[in-house]
Amino acid sequence: MEKWARIKYTPNLPLGENGERVTASQKHIELSCEAACEGMVLLKNDRNVLPIRKGTRVALFGKGVFDYVKGGGGSGDVTVPYIRNLYEGLSQYTSDISIYDKSVRFYQEYVADQYRLGIAPGMIKEPALPEDILADAAAYADTAIIAISRFSGEGWDRKVAGVDREIKCEAKDLVEQGNKIFDHGDFYLTNAEKKMVKMVKENFSSVIVVMNVGGVVDTTWFKKDDQISSVLMAWQGGIEGGLAAARILLGKVNPSGKLSDTFAARLEDYPSTEGFHEDDDYVDYTEDIYVGYRYFETIPGAKEKVNYPFGYGLSYTTFLLEDYKAEPFVASAADEVGKSDSDLADAIVASVTVTNIGKIPGKEVVQLYYSAPQGKLGKPAKVLGGYAKTRLLQPGESQRVTIALYMEDMASYDDLGKVKKAAWLLEKGEYHFFLGTSVRDTRLLDYTYELSKNIIVEQVSNKLVPTSLPKRMLADGTYEELPQTEPVDTYATIFPRPKNWKETIEHDVLKTPVVRPQDRFQLFLPPKEGDPKKFIEVAECKVTLEDFIAQLSNEQLASLLGGQPNVGMANTFGYGNLPEVGVPNAQTCDGPAGVRIAPEVGVVTTAFPCSTLLACTWNEDICYEVGVAGGEEAKECNFGAWLTPAVNIHRSPLCGRNFEYYSEDPFLAGKQAAAMVRGIQSNNIIATPKHFALNNKESNRKGSDSRASERAIREIYLKAFEIIVKEQSPGASCLQYNIVNGQRSSESHDLLTGILRDEWGFEGVVVSDWWGFGEHYKEVLAGNDIKMGCGYTEQLLEAIDKKALKRKDLEKRQSESSRCFSNSTKLKAA
């Protein structure tokens, strides 16, 4: 009853020990800092300049020293009690180092002035560095630290040089500000930043760079420069990102992060760059399954374009990997139930001994890759199949690391019928396995898995088939033409549209229902004879869900299929809100970096590191702990659902929302996010993986068509969601705005019912993204349970009158959401 009572009274009561709040508590803030330390990646450390030795005098340069970006904008933003920048982090250790003060004051005053003008963090122009300050700093110190920061956010994509046309987006002020600052696009240094870096290099023998960014940026300027000694990819580290970076720079923490993306030499080296801003109305995913390292490790000539490979990251200590082993593993008979083919071995178990042969404690990440035969389908040269992070190993200490890979997880999808149409299959031939510490630093294991025939792992049916994608890339770098079909008119509707309907945001038309304050007190009134059945009786198994729904009128059912008004501290609306039958208005909250509450409410929460950083921890335990902590804050602030994690793929560095997402690799993204879901739901808070699916571009996000092959969709863009659904049974799934192969995702029966529910067994509630362009009645038919931020009750009732909908369609959608809410106290826990 605790959950229900909290919904009834909407309190903000402390849940911590001794009556203390958990929201933005010191414990959670320390966890945020710990997670940030775990995911920051040391890219370069020539001459072992890092860690900075005790007694060193340092000078700080770059507006990023104070212009610290804790995370991206939009749903990923968080209202926090404070933010600790790099200078403030280093200032905690003045007993270890001395900091030159004049450059500090210069940047502090400059950044403060820019903030007062209303310029967003990360969007401030680099100021000209006064020569007298530089000369004085060089006389004071021989070690310089340069900080570079970047910002991006929801509703707009990163700037790229050479695109002069106006791009449709929802944050024109930020785009215009970026146009003023970034001479070559924000992937590269600005001219002002280049000048500052050049001046610093000319005056200091040791130069350290700290990158405070949310996504992939140019690394060529420091990789090939011997004058830059060390580089820390600090990402966007949340509330304590500056302190976390300081701890690593000073050796208080040994870095153990590994890249979750490939860092190429140039933006143009990513195949997705070409065509990203070609048109606002569509994006062709012509690189197909060759995304990230799958491209750079496979396509001829692409390897040489990589500066830092996927999985790469340095440490202050040295690890020795030895005694590599690999062997087949056959599960027990109980585990074999449901296997699709008796000829399919269950798994390979790979293991290696990791020893810290250095002088300080540290952690290492062991990564297992596999290589499948090219066959008729074509495959990437390597694919991540498993990983494990060691515990903190003391000097001389060893740990045996074991990783299992199920053979069926190596299956490829045949969309065109080259082997067996619409089937997940393993092609005959040899499968090889590699174990190491990055996609490049691996050893071929002495075990080969050989198939003498093709094995069908799962037979499904074609879904989300493209109609307008002209071609796709093959493993040799050439392209094959794809069949073109006549697109279906998915914009057809039984209702008249305004002439400018594509430009009309629905919440300008739809009216959010008003909550009567006194209705809240009807939720838990004792039932009287003749009263309607109450929802709490369903949760208590006194009334069947079918009987409860059967008593509802069409109007009541239609109302429940739309989002409900904000109450309490919410700003992203609620689910439910039918008090006459005891259905509460359970509130939702953003977002991927922490519980987002509007500043005017006066409640601050913990800002955790951006999801890209969390992916770079390669540590499911830390993601689980962040999920637990965030779930506790959501619960204490009386939210029923947390709209996280966001698990779209880093297809292109240009996506403005990559900071919310984990990786270019769906397996890594899925496993890390699944751990977070497990943590969230241990609090009986509904986790909501989003944005389902192919949300890889923010420009014109409500009207852009993502055109991809069915194989790429299934193997790359849906795989992380599939892992989460099958491993952690999330209570909800949030859709995306865009169109997929000509059909709006919220209206796609293939996506919502065919794949999500029928193939994967999803049993939660599906919600649209807020204020999308989908027709509500078509969303109901497709399998969308709740239209957010509010529904269109009148349209649903009219659709029933026009025979476009049946009452049973509404009942089906309501049964999905009611089952989710009534079972919310039984969600998977730790």
From Swiss-Prot:
Keyword annotations from UniProtKB, A to Z: Carbohydrate metabolism, Cellulose degradation, Glycosidase, Hydrolase, Polysaccharide degradation
A GO molecular function held by the record: beta-glucosidase activity
Highest taxon of the lineage: Bacteria
Catalytic activity: Hydrolysis of terminal, non-reducing beta-D-glucosyl residues with release of beta-D-glucose
Active site, per annotation: 769
Enzyme class: hydrolase
The enzyme's E.C. designation: 3.2.1.21
GO biological process, one term: cellulose catabolic process
Pfam family, one: Fn3-like
Family: Belongs to the glycosyl hydrolase 3 family.
Function: B.fibrisolvens beta-glucosidase hydrolyzes cellobiose to a limited extent, cellotriose to cellobiose and glucose, and cellotetraose and cellopentaose to predominantly glucose.
PANTHER family xrefs: BETA-GLUCOSIDASE
UniProt name for this protein: Beta-glucosidase A
Organism the protein comes from: Butyrivibrio fibrisolvens
